[in-house]
A protein has these predicted regions:
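Anaerobic metallocofactor- and corrinoid-dependent redox/one-carbon enzyme cores
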Residues: 1-174, 189-457
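Catalytic domains of carbohydrate-active enzymes, especially glycoside hydrolases
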Residues: 176-189
Length: 457
């Protein structure tokens, strides 16, 4: 079945729902690389016009990957609330957009409707929204989860403290950890990307994180972001761990390229419920990012926004504690410049929240992108206004191990003050006890990691 519209006397024809969706998206270098992007601005507007009139039922009937061949599609479809979908199946994508932006749509009503939405519906409405629409709609939605503490409450903007080190030296990691804590970072997670994906290396870092957490009575979560199978083995061997992590894709083929399947995640979740160190019930952490499916030829000819939305359909089955897009990490082949990175960050956050995901963002870029730190600060502030659950922090914005740039430890204090945000309440009380915060602001001791050495190590 073809689709067509006429704009400025020119007829535009699209062969499939997938083509309409791809060409309706904002310009992304990754979609150009995949050969699915609109050839011109007017073709993009024509595709948006067609998509706006498409019903949610049509999108349900046309998933990006076939149900019979892809477990992400099966999770996406099988997890749908049929009663709620039946109430809105006749809506057009334009109807959904207008409703989301109306006063009728609030946190409770959006959460209910979201149970009747597939990833393709979520991606489609995203494509009809401006950046301001994405911010306005997302800030209506609060998605909370509990591990040791609760993430996602209103007026809370958390951080993952990322003390990466080029050799996984635990003393170097600990020094960076203390610096991050001294700036008020780490309420959502103390989480390291390891250089060495071995059970022994992960266990050594986890033990140090656990020691620091208990020595200073820090209300937070710990995780070392090795491969899911390595983490599983480390926990089985007794390593203390609050959450298990895995990068995920929007297709089964993409996940298998990452070296896992839904069955692996099922095993990890059950293991954490029986041998993990957290209270739970939310004990998983996922990362995503537009373009990963194309990089493994696992995108099924779909655009990167649609495949990203499918990541959230996969994730919501597992009720994770935290999910974040690593928005600019994959490079300019997929997001060319700051305009595309900012747009993608806002898209990912909105789509995840609409999918019921406790969403954060690694506001980052690589050195060969047409972006700089000012752009990342802009994105961080926009996401803060949109109600993002958390961002990441590293020393002076420069991750010396991953060789990319993200937010600095000291950024979060500025953003919280500007927007009237706070750390997770239990963590803020701990910061006050340590003398790092007072009356909602950082004190003169902020940024001084030696306060931890004086108090214990």
């Amino acid at each position: 079945m073809g689709y067509h519209t006429i704009l400025s006397g020119q007829r535009f024809t699209f062969d499939s729902v997938k083509e309409v969706m791809a060409k309706a998206g904002e310009h992304k270098s990754g979609d150009v690389l995949a050969g699915v992007a609109a050839a011109s601005d007017i073709e993009r507007i024509a595709a948006k016009d067609v998509l706006a009139g498409m019903t949610l039922r049509e999108l349900y009937e046309n998933p990006a990957a076939p149900y019979e061949e892809d477990e992400v599609t099966r999770i996406n479809i099988d997890g749908l609330n049929r009663k709620i979908f039946g109430e809105i199946a006749g809506w057009t994508v334009s109807d959904l957009r207008e409703w989301l932006l109306s006063y009728e749509a609030d946190n409770e009503t959006i959460h209910r409707i979201s149970r009747g939405l597939t990833a393709e519906m979520v991606a489609s409405v995203c494509k009809l929204m401006t950046n301001l629409d994405l911010i306005y709609a997302a800030q209506k939605i609060r998605v909370t989860a509990h591990c040791n503490t609760t993430v996602g409450e209103r007026d809370i903007m958390g951080t993952r403290l990322q003390p990466n080190h080029t050799t996984d030296n635990v003393e170097g990691i600990t020094a960076s950890l203390f610096e991050g804590l001294s700036y008020g970072c780490g309420d959502v997670l103390i989480g390291l990307n390891p250089v060495n994906d071995t059970v022994s290396s992960l266990a050594e870092v986890l033990k140090r994180f656990d020691e620091v957490k208990h020595q200073f009575d820090i209300p937070t979560q710990i995780c070392v972001l090795g491969h899911i199978t390595t983490q599983i083995e480390a926990v089985k061997q007794g390593a203390p761990c609050d959450m298990i992590f895995q990068s995920i894709a929007g297709s089964e083929k993409g996940n298998r390229a990452f070296g896992f399947s839904a069955e692996t995640v099922d095993e990890a979740q059950e293991l954490m419920r029986t041998q993990g160190t957290a209270a739970g019930p939310n004990v998983l952490y996922f990362e995503t990012g537009q373009g990963s499916e194309l990089s493994s030829n696992a995108h099924w000819g779909a655009d990167q926004v649609t495949m990203e939305a499918r990541c959230y359909a996969f994730a919501r089955k597992y009720h994770p504690f935290m999910v974040n897009t690593v928005v600019g990490f994959i490079g300019p082949e997929y997001l060319y410049d700051s305009k595309q990175v900012i747009r993608a960050g806002l898209e990912d956050h909105f789509m995840a929240k609409l999918s019921g995901i406790p969403m954060g963002c690694d506001c980052c870029y690589t050195n060969h992108m047409m972006a700089d730190q000012n752009d990342i600060e802009n994105l961080s502030l926009l996401l803060g206004a949109a109600g993002v659950n958390y961002i990441l922090g590293v020393p002076t914005s420069d991750d010396i191990m991953l060789n990319y740039q993200t937010n600095a430890y000291h950024d979060i204090g500025t953003i919280r003050e500007i927007l009237g945000k706070h750390p997770i309440p239990a963590f803020e009380r701990w910061l006050e006890k340590m003398g790092i915060m007072e009356n909602g602001r950082l004190t003169k001791y902020a940024g001084d990691p030696t306060i931890f050495m004086k108090k214990g190590r």
